């Protein structure tokens, strides 16, 4: 994927628990394969949200970040997901691993159905730099999205 640039642009490639409407966020679980703030051209984040680690009064989410040339060419964002860990990569370079612990479902809701969301948002209270009014049009370019196995997703 090639990330757009511009103050207030917020592309994300993520996975959300399919029971979101029944149990709500963050109980459903969220895996951000990649998030990017358009005002920070080369900085991307891979983040794990759940009932224990979240921005709703829990412990701040576990996040891995990297400085890559996100806006100037296609990059491959990847999560390897198995029953005990989530490993994050950009262009094959390892970012970090989130491990299942003995804390139960509050720390590991990742043993249920999830669905993929590829989106480009504009503005948010999470934006570190505000939003420009004259940055449009913008686009998030995705060459392909591949599910390698039932719990492994690769987006490029």
Enumerate the predicted regions with their spans.
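GH16 jelly-roll
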Residues: 1-156
């Amino acid at each position: 994927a090639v990330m757009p640039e511009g103050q207030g642009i917020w592309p994300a490639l993520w996975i959300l628990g399919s029971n979101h409407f029944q149990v709500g966020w963050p109980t459903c679980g969220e895996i951000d394969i990649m998030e990017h703030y358009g005002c920070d051209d080369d900085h991307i984040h891979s983040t794990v949200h759940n009932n224990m680690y979240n921005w709703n009064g829990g412990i701040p989410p576990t996040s891995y970040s990297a400085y890559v040339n996100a806006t100037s060419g296609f990059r491959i964002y990847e999560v390897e997901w198995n029953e005990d860990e989530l490993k994050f990569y950009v262009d094959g370079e390892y970012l970090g691993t989130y491990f299942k612990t003995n804390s139960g479902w509050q720390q590991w809701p990742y043993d249920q159905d999830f669905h993929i969301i590829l989106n480009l948002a504009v503005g948010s209270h999470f934006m570190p730099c505000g939003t420009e009014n004259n940055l449009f049009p913008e686009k998030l370019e995705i060459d392909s999205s591949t599910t390698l196995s039932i719990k492994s997703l690769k987006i490029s």
